[in-house]
Amino acid sequence: MEKALAHIDWSAMTPELILVTAAALLIVLELLLPDEASRDWLGWLALLAVVGAGTYVAVHFGATAVDLLQGSYRTDPVAQSFKLVLLGGSALILLMSLSRENREGIRARGEYYFLLLTAVLGASMMTSSADLVTLFVGLELLSISSYILAGIRKQRTDSNEAAWKYVVLGGVSSAFILYGMSFVYGLTGSTNLFVVQQRIVEAYQTGYASFVLLSLFLMMLGFGFKIAAAPFHMWAPDVYQGSPTSVTAFLAVVSKTAAFALVTRIVLVAYLQLIELRVWEEIITPLLLVIAGASMIIGNAVALRQTNVKRLMAYSGIAQAGYVLVPLASLGMALFESTLYYLLAYSLMTVGVFAVIMAVERDAEHGELSAFAGLYRRSPLVALTMTLMVLSLAGIPVTAGFFGKFYILINAIATQHFWIAAVMVVTTVISYFYYFELIRQMYFRPAPKGNPLAIPISTAIVIGIGVIGTVGLGLFPNAVLHALGQLKWTEVLSIPQTPPGP
Amino acid sequence: MTVWNGLPTWVTFSPLLGMLVLLFIPRQQNRWLKWVGMAGTVPPLILALIMFAKFDPQARGVQFAQNVSWIHIPLPQSSGWKLSYAMGADGLSISLVVMTTIIAALAAVGSMYLKERLKSYFLLFLLLEIGMLGVFLARDLFLFFLFFEVTLVATFFLVGIWGYMERERAANQFLLYNGLGSALMLLAFISLMFVFGTLNLDQLQVRTSQLFAHPEWMQGPVKPVIWGIFLCILVAFGIKLPAFPFHTWMLRVHVEAPPAVVMIHSGVLLKMGAYGLIRFGVDLFPPLVHQMATCLAALGLVNILYGAALAFVQRDLKRVLAYSSVSHMGIILFGIAALNFTGLQGAVFQAVSHGFISALMFLIVAALYERTGTTMIDEMSGLAKAMPVLSGVLLAGGLALLGLPGMSGFVSEFLAFLGMFKPYPVIAGIGALGLILAAVYTLRAVMAATFGPFLDRWERLTDSKAVETVPMLVLLGLIIAIGVYPQMLGEPMQTTLQMIVTRIGG
């Protein structure tokens, strides 16, 4: 079993290695560069690293699963697809924060870029881990980087408050996850997910059922926090509002995608065998569905009363988290496909929306909804692109967001969970109100200023990709569906050929 | 016929041509924007008329059919879902398509009163036309839903930006009700997909017939699902129609939307409800409709009487027309509930006829409002002296509205009630009261507005201009043409309706 480090096929880890090298390089350069030197090119370096990592994943997309480091690290179809989504999202966010205009008062540019890189690295590790320890390391790498990023505008009180809240509540949630993981280890004697999968049934049947469930509940508490699902969502609005917009976009897109990768992997791989004991059906599904339903209801209902755009997006994100949980909860027939499709659509539209928010916020110097007033008269094209992406978030055809919801709805109905389908449908209609409030501001309200909104070129590219992706995936979802349909998801759930020792 | 296979697609997407040209016209060029906007409705009109001319009334089934596979959702343990881009026209859709293109063209002319943001107005207007035409021509339920939602979004903007004082509330209410309706529709369609494995209309017809041919399904687990789907469809299109008690949003839109949009809304959008009820309710679920027929008839009765009674007490001409629409939609429900050939024919006739009549009435209201600055009946008093032509057309429109023989409204109401009297003589008898009430409220409103004491402030008013008179006369001509020669409308739909009636066994 013991392999020398030299014999390990490190190429499977190339994306992570690129990211870690670039992050290290950035730290060193930041230290060596004189204080007055421009740090703008560090951002380009970071972007290059993320694009490079993404390209590597894209080129090797669809390859069979590879196990590394005694089975604690794995590149399989799930990891690859999640990684593509989050690397793509990160690249767009980096591109968005590159331009001179979009600095948002972030003074420590070098720090900002390498923290983003370490956060992406953590996210990337989370998608590829098959071991509780590596999962947790990835999670904490992502979390701690995010805490600092949230508070990177040291001189601003709201940024400080955001970071403070995020650290405290994030720490608590990590503790819950760790506590849950410790039960798993105690019950099965292993941290490897596939070993856990085999042994947890035994533990369940030999009188430790309550502990098995306790471990799951504790972890779900923490996961609920990480994906900002109700009722663990309280941090999201404050953190979203206080962070710089680029960081908010990162939290909304990359952090959330990574957290979903984590939830999917742990819940599905570790507890999969419980399906046969009907535990899934009787306990896990209702538990997840309640979280999903609560997220949809609370997220959409509270969003109605928001006047700050980023808070609105936070509640919208809470609601969207509820939608994405449905396929996992119901063990729908196209679980991975629909989850990934939705996350991809969500990333594209959310990044695009945040790019517009960033430009509008800078122009109006505040983040209230009224900053969007009359945008249509000032910059019709920006207003139109924003409209398309907001319509997509609301789930109006012919957009990616619609098809994503449609796909998830199929899962809910196929598994006969009609009540969650009904909740989805009703809350979606409710969500029209606040999404259309943005549209009302842009089209129905008079503009306070007459000048067109200034959009830096890099932001324009991000918005362009967001819109093209949103509409393109809405009209021709087949492009992605076909690729997703080709992947062998079952490999993810099955045990690797040579199960590693405890 | 193969050359014409793409015709429905051409008709549906031909407004794109106008949109494309509009994009290149600067925002300030109001004159040009108006002309191009109006011209943009001509290609679909011409193509629809070509389609109407090429349509073979004797042929059974769909004509100009087109079917391209579009989205394939891979699913484990099955071949997955195939959604297709399927378009085509049958007797039910052809007349509605022609009506849509005519009303759209005239409503574009009716948009002349608008003064601001014309570019986006006409872009949305043409987008709305694409949606409406697509709704009537789609042969796949998923595709139907997409077009349906396009009309929703376009109408929201048209009402919310260019409407009157309370436009935003109207737009919001429109969005809420219709959003809920579409959501129910989507749930129904997805469930249909699960039960029958397809969303293609022609395949669905075959598979539902197969299911209903075996009465055992009533005992099976599929029964509640089928009923659920059916009720969702009824409510979804009931909201759109609108059937009582889902009508409140429609009143607001009628009052607050800009005149041209009300022409479209009252003329075409409400008819999508009727179309959906017949196409997806009656045609796909015959045995269920039979069980619900009494309920539909009762709803129709409530619509007729409630709408008529409230139309009578309104003092705003727009509200009179709005409530009269509620009343007239009840007649469509009657026609459907009758479940026989005559009744269904009456329902479709009423859909088309009311489309033209209400478009005409709102065009006149817009012209009056433009001159007098009011739509309150009491304040209009004595218009006939200052504007004989407009008042004359208003009177003629009113006569059409109350169903004077020789005009389209009479034929439709006659057919619908004739169909209704066979299965439900009592309900039909009470419903007939609505016809009398219609005469009362229409004449009261029209007379009070045009005759009565002449007001001095009307001295300087000008009568209607040619650009207003022409569309009015075209509509009036169509209304009379259908009234005098109903075969024009009846012939193309005959075969299709007969097929539906055979399926429902009525």
Please state what every model-predicted region is.
Chain A
Residues M1-P502:
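Alpha-helical transmembrane segments of multi-pass membrane proteins predominantly involved
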